[in-house]
């Protein structure tokens, strides 16, 4: 008998399991809109979060991979007089130095391409500061004509392996043949000088030639750099190097080089962007998902009671509904990861946004270690929320579970007790009562609108801040047509002859030590106003002759303010010069600015190395005095590319925020429509037309949207401020949000909310008044 009962129980259990599977499919179909919207919410939240975290991690991974494969130097010793073979051996004798090489990079004009320049590098040891071969012959240090050219420059200018090329530097012609196409860590961000933001391989590239070709053309070995591979800390290495060479030399750690610092800046920027805005996407999606899951189980209360009455054990009912939450969160997470990788690939590929900035041989997508554990935690959390929601509905007997869900009684609002309340239109009163009764739904709608507003205003704010910075610093700050670079061998008379001939302002740049920090000291004579400097309030000022001007980063790092005194030490000597801080300015690099008269007053030695003139580049002839000429147009063209990349990133954020906002509000609106179905049917019975009911719904969403915008805009400004602080190590920008940004944010957010309201209001036409009013009886 017991065996028959056991067999019958097994049979019933099998049928029960099959019934639950069918019910799950019916539930998915019945609530398909809610389930699809929840999946999309999780997908968007995780997709945006993973995308921007993959971006910075991939930059970091591929950057270090190139640095390792091209033997990127840890330190660079610089001496304008050059280093001998004996100097190199003295550095190699330092304990902890792995390898070293004499090195030089020169900017030369390409004779076959008028106006083009190429940074030519020569290393005496290929195991230090070399390159990665993409195509062609291996490097040969004894080659008399070998040129290993940037593959990007070759592609943009249709240059092939085997083609002849010639360059001119300081009136010296270097001839050779392209033996290979390469990428190099030293030129990962290939720009002609520090004023250019974005690479332009159409007009500027890089190449390596052999020491044999270089020394044979020049006639003697001149190497102003020794590049070093070492794990010694910067302070110790500096002391040991000075001791080995017998004097103080300029030593630049890799962290201060252009390629390394700019790439690190991109990583830091990516971390900041990936930890603030995408986190908001994730938070909005999760909060709304939790609310929706709870309300779905409330809607299923009678179904839960029916299953309980049929004899299904609580554990099976719990497993059934918890499985729904698990499937939704898992499917949304899988799709989110796929979306994240897809968006990251759009950004991180040779033809993508970052491909125009970084010159990398490998574009592997890498995710930070914490992304997948976090996604697992999210799936577990959402599943657990589903479990708690259904567990709450199972309390009590089957008959109690079968009874319809009754919202808790809400106390009358204070305003309801006043005479004013009776004067308020019926629709407004109805909306106020509904908002108070359904606080959670209202709160989630507010979260969606606030989040959308924060992301939108922050994105537009970044765009406007960057545009203003570039406009003030470059468009209006650089008032010259061409920048002339003078030869190191030119005499003072020859330099002043060029200044007079082209009626230009002039400057000199040298590296100095401020405490243990290497910074640029820029000395200017700007009588013609060819360069304008801006203070920390983004206002132009003239450089005076009785003090120094320091950038904001130096001011903050060394706690220096106007009137303070500080000391600098030029490399190659033991002198110290005391300076008074005359002002603080915004800059794209860590530098100090003084006038030529103040430099002469302090007896600071310098050589004029650049002239700023209104004469066009094509009208300036190269000579043994003028080594190269750059036009302002080259710099401004690079900004267009930079702004295009930045704008695409920000548009992606705004589009994602609007899509997420629409999904969140539509999901909550649909659930709200289901909850208020009977109330709206009652309104139809007493004579309200569909248009009038729709207007009531519009007004409620409009009220919530306005409140969300009012709260979201200040929070968005705080978010933008936080992001700018995290980017302060790379840019010294003043936050700028104009009226257009506010208007666009308000219009987009309201349009999104009203669009969703319209979609929900259209459902009023399908209300069955008889069925709705007798449903709970």
What are these regions (language model features)?
Residues 21-25, 36, 256-259, 315-319, ...:
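Alpha-helical membrane-protein architecture signal
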Residues 136, 162, 311, 336, ...:
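Conserved G/P- and acidic residue-centered "switch" motifs that form tight phosphate/ATP-binding loops
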Residues 1-37, 299-303, 309, 313-316, ...:
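Feature of multi-pass inner-membrane transport and sensor proteins
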Residues 76-77, 426-557, 561-564, 568-570, ...:
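Juxtamembrane segments of multi-pass membrane proteins
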Residues 3-286, 295, 354, 469, ...:
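Membrane transport/envelope proteins' first extracytoplasmic loop
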Residues 246, 290-295, 300-302, 326-359, ...:
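Small-residue-rich transmembrane alpha-helices
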Residues 31, 287-327, 663-703:
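Interfacial "coupling" helices/loops that link adjacent transmembrane helices in transporter permeases
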Residues 608-611, 622-744, 750, 756-759, ...:
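C-terminal transmembrane helical bundles of large multi-pass transporters
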